[in-house]
Amino acid sequence: MNTAFEFLKANPVFHVATVDGDAARARPFGFVMAYNDKLYICTNKTKDVFKQMQKNPEIEISGMGAEGTWLRIRGKVAVDDSYEAKKQAFKESPMLLQIYPRGADDENYVTLYFTGAVATLYSFTSAPKNLPLF
């Protein structure tokens, strides 16, 4: 895998860590897309994770791969509440309709993209290396 996006698509469950006051919070995510030269995730505006990202947009993604590799992406996220980004997310992952039956018209569904992110691939057997996002 040559990019962070490829890694996350091949290993679709990853964890998103945020800050809640003075405590770290992590939870599993499963959606990622490359769109308009940006790496996107999505969530629900009513969830604590979104509120935490609004208050402190510095987050980190961590995903485990095969053969003792793992990926970390650290950076800020910004909201893209455009209909086009939401529509693209449902096009790329129709299973999201099980969670958001109204699709891109769901007012609680939100897409976010990384800004200034650094992706690093780690291994138990070799030195860490930076990867392009996509």
For the regions a protein language model found, what residue spans apply to each?
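Charged, gly/pro-rich active-site loop segments
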Residues: R72-F134
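Charged, amphipathic alpha-helical segments
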Residues: M1, T43-T46, P94-Q98
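Short, surface-exposed charged micro-motifs
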Residues: G30-F31, T111
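Acidic-histidine catalytic/liganding microenvironments
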Residues: N11, N56, S93
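A short, Trp-centered hydrophobic/proline-enriched beta-strand micro-motif
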Residues: E6-G21, I59-G63
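Short glycine/serine/proline-enriched coil/turn segments at secondary-structure junctions
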Residues: G21-A23, E67-T69, Y122
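Structural motif
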Residues: V13, K38, E58, K76, ...
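A short mixed-secondary-structure module that forms the rim of ligand-binding clefts
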Residues: V32-G68
